[in-house]
Structures are given as structure tokens and as C-alpha cells.
Amino acid sequence: MKIKVLTYNIHKCVGGVDRRYDLGRIVEIINHHQPDIALLQEVVRHSKSLSDTLQVDVIGEAIGLSHRVWVPNVRVSEARGYGNAIFSRWPLIESVNIDLTIGPKKKRSALYARVRAPIFSQRAGQSQTRSLHLFNLHLGLSGIERRMQLKKLLLHASVQRVAKNTPIIVAGDLNDVWGSLGRQVMGPAGFHGVRRKPKTFPAYAPVRPLDSLYVRGKIRVENLLPSRLAIARQASDHLPLVAELILGQE
């Protein structure tokens, strides 16, 4: 079964060049790509125009992904805290926020969720569901910090308990300036990505592969590309990454 996953640091819906808050641009981009799962970073608590409504709910309703979870990493203030969010076409069975903060560094975390995705079983001759484990990350700014954070994640029970054949997706803003985390950390842990890392930062003229996606188990990456929409170069300081994945059977 083919599924589409989008990962996107939305920069609190503030344009990377014009510095203008515009949630509508973010929604337009996501709706264009029609993902089954969206992993967003830097989602704020409240939208400016709807101060009593959680931004995760506004976005979720606008992109038609009704199953969602959001946890703030950074609390600038109670109203303006921001963090990671997962949106899914299919029900979220469980979720947990995993602290990846290293010492006195800025607070960082991975948001974990498990969904039951539908697949067609040739053996059974009918549609079934299977578990898909999602990890949405926003890693630190130093190379040592990022490697330590990924290793901390890989040792967490939410990863360790998952059987080797069960599909896992690890994606997000990895701040992977040199595109080396796959070779240094994820590959040795049994995860696969793409050989040529798509450049996503800065959005208006990308030169760095800060964002990425890795999989393990009965799932493979068929395509991983940055959005080529003109509006995506304005809406945030990152481009979204869009992945087409092939999900295998149990």
C-alpha cells in the first residue's frame, strides 16, 4: 500500500522572508500535497486570529486530518508555547512525548504516535490494518547534540519495543546541516532513507538538508522530495518534505 507523509517545520506560520504570519499559506501547501500523515514542527498553542482555539485544531480541520496530537516543547508564554504535532487520516491508538533535551541546551523532544493503517492482504483477500509507528522530531543546533538526541531516542522504550519488521517512520526537522545523521546514526540502527538528501533550508533558496525522513521495518521510501510550490518558498523558513512510502503487509 502506498501512503503519503509530509514533514514540515512551519516556523509558527511566519514567512521566512516577509516575516508575515499567515496560517492560510501553510494550509494551502499541505492541502495541495494531500498527505495521509502530516508531521509538523513549531506549531504554536493558539492562532493569532482565534486566540481561544488551539492551532493544531484549526490546522487539522482545514487539512481534513481529524486525528491529531500536539505537545509544546518550548513555553515562551502559556499562550505562545510551540511544539510538534502529528495529523493522521487514521486513528491514533496511543501517543507520548519523549524528552530529548541534552543538559542545559534548549528543550527538545520527539512526539510519538501509533496508528493503524489500512492495507490489502493478498493472503486474506481482504483489507486489514497494521501498526505504523511515527516519531516527529525537532533536534538541536549542534552536531554532537543532534547525535546524542537521536541515540537517546533509539534507546527509548517506544522504539525498543517495536519488532524489527514493524514499520517505523522517524522524520522532522533534524537540523542535519551536513546530511550526515543517516550515515552516522540512523543507518547503523537499521533505518533507511534516501541517498541524496533533499535541501529544504532556507526555503527561498535551499542549500541545506535540515529536514529528513527515515524508515525501518516493512516499509520503504519510494520518493522523498521538497515541495516545489512557489508559495512554499514564502510561507516558512523551511520547505516541506513530501514522502511516498510503500507499506508492507504483516
Report the location of each language-model feature.
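Active-site neighborhood of divalent metal-dependent phosphoester/pyrophosphate hydrolases
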Residues: 41-49
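A short, gly/pro- and small-residue-rich
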Residues: 57-59
